[in-house]
């Protein structure tokens, strides 16, 4: 069940649960966060619960290469396009260094597609997970962490600007996918973009 966590609850210097956006508190013995360390510690736990040394270290942390991951379910027979359990590395050309430089230095919201993506059909890799109709994909590209727009605070990640950003990036990744699976856009059942922020 997808829930928006706004706070990790701390009692006697120990994480004891989480608080949801609706105010509900869920207590637990173990709390797991898959957010960046700075988001987990500074935004969800809060500086007031951290040592000065940890706060200083978090503020000095320089993120470098990261990735954007499009999680996708398609309602179509993708085998007709040669999709199997193999991985697909799609590059706009053979110059890996130039593609990498473009990903690291460009504005990630500009353009129609990315110069390099990795595509994997998880239902072909794990046939037991295939229900006979829907295929799941992961479409991944790498980017410079600093090229991500700055969204401050938990609320910004539910703002209209953040949704527009995610839609632009998802559309670009779908354009990459369409090059090997024509008609993919018309057969999307579920789509979600994972970002490092």
Regions found by a protein language model. Give the residues of each.
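Short loop/edge segments at beta-strand edges and connector loops
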Residues: 1-3
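Mid-domain catalytic core of redox enzymes
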Residues: 6-131
